[in-house]
Swiss-Prot record:
Homotetramer. This is Chorismate synthase. It is an enzyme of class 4 (lyase). Reduced FMN (FMNH(2)). Coiled coil: none annotated.
Amino acid sequence: MGSSFGDLFRISTFGESHGGGVGVIVEGCPPRLELDLDEIQAELNRRKPGQSHITTPRKEADQVEILSGLLDGKTTLGTPIAMLVRNKDQRPGDYSDMAVAFRPSHADATYQSKYGIQARSGGGRASARETIGRVAAGAIAKQLLRKAAGTEILAWVKQIHTIEAHGIDPSTVSMNDIEANIVRCPEASVANQMIERIEAIGREGDSCGGVIECVVRQPAVGLGMPVFDKLEADLAKAVMSLPATKGFEIGSGFSGTLLKGSEHNDAFIPGDDGRLHTATNNSGGIQGGISNGEPIVIRVGFKPTATIRKEQQTIDSDGNATTLAAKGRHDPCVLPRAVPMVEAMVALTLADHLLRQQGQCSLW
């Protein structure tokens, strides 16, 4: 329970951080889609640990194995696609202290309370390694959306701790801009400040959080359904299911609460393509829970990494007060590696809604 996502384009992830491997089963992908397997691996490379000095030093190749669902290794059959990444660089001994003391603000205590047992080594299903399956499946969803509607999905780091980038234009930012530095902030001068802040906080044995922004350019019109299956509601659920997420905004977000209706409303204007367009995009590309064809713009807040080397007050499994200074290899800031995770969850949501839209509204 709780390890599957989606309705028609549905994924189920499996595996633990220090188990044999992690992976995903993708169901509902349409047949005859020619997949670029290098693109799937490239997305996993963006997510994998050890890619820079501001991420966890754990070394994993994260090489994907596709076990089923493809003809000649590239063409989807319409049957379940199973993908596996084997764990290689495990150090269970780093978690000996955590076997008896709960990490503050981590899932240790709540998993123990719920199940009466937990995978203490590496955090089990609460580890960010669970997201490998999401990113691999999201890479397939990205290719489906691009072929079906010309949709492009890009995310980047907008804020680290108190340092925020203000000069990024969602309509023009490119993948090259985002990947130009290790923090994945397209505003170069701000990126350098972010890197220095992560380094400084990491040296203290501490961690920091921030905000990732994501844009969907050329989304299909009509995605989403009234009331309980609104597109923004499903996007919020998707990205808020990622580890360490604590906040979600779309369009103007909370700043829109400071405007009057006359200031916030997106005036409709005719477009050269024969479609309705809006003069502004405070709605973030979604109105009434349904995509209007304008860029979808969301922001996701991530808390500081819970596992830190700094000594903290906690309790042990018997309820006694103790302290914990975590060992192991952990990200001082999750955001640089979370960028492809956000893109993946957005892609999976849109792919699912695209199939639902086609199934309901394209019969005649």
